[in-house]
């Protein structure tokens, strides 16, 4: 799951993993995440925009935060 999130983030934000200064806790807004790119990432990750998940992801815009939220959703429904 982490690799999928990382690949999507790197693709949409045009960054490399080395740009994550604080590792997976790096605030993606510091790397160019804005509302348009957020929507692109939600599409790329297959997140249902009608669910509450996008707002939970927006509250913690980091790879680590997204991994926690997405794994929790997979556990809830898995």
Curated annotation (Swiss-Prot):
SUPFAM superfamilies: ACP-like (SSF47336). One of its GO terms (biological process) is fatty acid metabolic process. InterPro entries: ACP-like_sf, PP-bd_ACP. Pathway: Lipid metabolism; fatty acid metabolism. Disruption phenotype: Cells lacking this gene are shown to be highly attenuated in a mouse tuberculosis model. Keywords: Fatty acid metabolism, Lipid metabolism, Phosphopantetheine, Phosphoprotein. It comes from the Bacteria. The keyword Electron transport does not apply. Residues 1-78 form the Carrier domain. The keyword Electron transport does not apply. Its cofactor is pantetheine 4'-phosphate. The modification O-(pantetheine 4'-phosphoryl)serine is found at residue 35. Acyl-carrier protein (ACP) involved in the biosynthesis of a unique class of isonitrile lipopeptides (INLPs) that seem to function as virulence factors in M.tuberculosis and to play a role in metal acquisition. Is the dedicated ACP for the loading of activated acyl groups catalyzed by FadD10. Belongs to the acyl carrier protein (ACP) family. This is Acyl carrier protein Rv0100. It comes from Mycobacterium tuberculosis (strain ATCC 25618 / H37Rv).
